[in-house]
Curated annotation (Swiss-Prot):
The keyword Protein transport does not apply. One of its GO terms (molecular function) is microtubule plus-end binding. Belongs to the WD repeat LIS1/nudF family. PANTHER family: WD REPEAT-CONTAINING PROTEIN POP1. One of its GO terms (cellular component) is cytoplasmic microtubule. It holds the Pfam family WD40. This is Nuclear distribution protein nudF. It comes from Aspergillus fumigatus (strain ATCC MYA-4609 / CBS 101355 / FGSC A1100 / Af293). It is found in: Cytoplasm, Cytoskeleton; Cytoplasm, Cytoskeleton, Spindle pole. InterPro entries: Dynein_regulator_LIS1, G-protein_beta_WD-40_rep, LIS1_N, LisH, PAC1-like_LisH-like_dom, WD40/YVTN_repeat-like_dom_sf, WD40_repeat_CS, WD40_repeat_dom_sf.
Amino acid sequence: MSQLLTARQAEELHKSIIAYLASVNLTESSAALRAELGDSVSIDDATLKKYEGLLEKKWTSVVRLQKKIMDLESRCAALQSELDSATPTSLLRKNQDPTSWLPRSPARHILEGHRNPVTCVAFHPVFSSLASGSDDTTIKIWDWELGELERTVKGHTKAVLDVDYGGPRGGTLLASCSSDLTIKLWDPSDNYKNIRTLPGHDHSVSSVRFIPSGAAGSPMSGNLLVSASRDKTLRIWDVTTGYCVKTLSGHVDWVRAVAPSIDGRFLLAAGDDRIPRLWDLSSAETKSTFLGHEHVIECVAIAPAASYPHLAVLSGLKKPPPASSSAEFFATGSRDKTIRLWDSRGNLIKTLVGHDNWVRALAFHPGGKHLLSVADDKTIRCWDLTQECKCVRVISDAHGHFVTCLRWAPPLIKDGGANGEAETNGTPAATSTTNGVRPDPNVATKISIRCVIATGSVDQKVRIFAT
C-alpha cells in the first residue's frame, strides 16, 4: 500500500473505510481496524461524518471512469479504422471530392424547438429550407445553412409521420402525412399556406413521396404523389385536383415506407408484412417481392445509377445495367437490425450487419459509392459499396436518443446557357429521390452534389451534418 499511496492518501483511505464500516453498522470491524491502526489515524465523530459516503463516491467514480475509458477506446478504434481506410490522397486533399464526402461529428447545427420526438425531415430542392415533422403535430421550417427556425406550420391534429418537397416544376409544394389519416399540401411560396387536404386513407398515413416526372408515361406525372398507410394500401394522388387516381393493394399489413424510382415508373414499398414489393405503376401490379427480413421493415431506398457499377460487382454481374434504367438495385432496413441489398429480380445481394437496434432510415450517397443508415442505437453508419459494404464510418454520438430519420439534400442541376456558361436553375438532379426531374437532353447539364444531410431523433432535435 505504501508503494502506491502517499501517507496522506493512505490516511484518508483508512478514515473512509472506518466511516463506511460504521455507516453500515459493522461496529466491531470498525473498532478492530481503529485499534490496529492505533495512533496513526486520529478519528472522531466529526471526522466520521466528514468521511461518511466518501468510499462509495470514490467507487462509483471509478466505475464511471472505466466506462468513459471503454467508450474512448472504442471511439479511438473507430477513428483508427477510418484513418486506415483513407487513402493518402484523401488525407491531403483540402477540398474533398463531393462524391466521396461523408458526414462526421460534430454536427454543424443542432435545431431545437419540437416538443416531442422528430419523425421526419425533408430538404427543399432549391433553397436552404428544411422541413421537420414531429409527434407534437407540427411541422417546422428551418434555414439549415443558418441553423435558424423560420416558421412553425400547424394543421395536423395528430403526429406528423412524413414530409416531402416536390410537385410540378416551378411550383414546389410541401406534402405531409399524419396519424390523423390525412395528407396536407402546403405552398412554400405563400407562407406555407395549406392549399389542399387529401382524405381517403382508413388509418395512419406513414409515408408520402412526390413521384418524379415520367411516371407511367403521364404528361401530368409531375403532379403525382404516393402515400403509404397502415390501412395496407398505397394511393396515388393528383395534387392539382386532390383526387386519388389509383390504389395499390397487395400488402397484407401496415405499409410503413415507400420510395419512387427516378423515372417515376416504379415504387418500392415495405412494412409490417416483412416483404418489400416493387410496384409497376403503369400496370398497378407487383413486379418483384423480396424475402429475407425477420422483422418489420422500417425503411426502403432505391439505388441511384451512380451505384450500379459497385452493386453490379456485388451481385456478380459482368457489367452494370445501363445508367438510363431505373429500379435496378434496392436497400431495405428492418427491426431485425440488418440492412439488405437486393436486385430487381428479388435476389439478395448482401446483408449488412452492424447496428445494435432497429434500422430506421437509409440514404444512398449521390456519388454512388456509399450507403448511409441510422438506427435506434443512436448512430449513423456509412457503408462502402466498393469495399464489400464495409462499414467505414460510425458517428456514435449522432443523437442522444433513437435516430428516427435521415435525408440527403438533393443535388442540383446546372443548365448550360446560350453562351455555354453553366447557370443554376434550381432544378433537383435526376439522381435525387425528391422531386427528381430529368434534365433537358438538348441542354448541357452538370450535377452539383450538396454535401448536407439531416437527421431527426426522439431527443426532439434535428441535426445538420455538412461540409
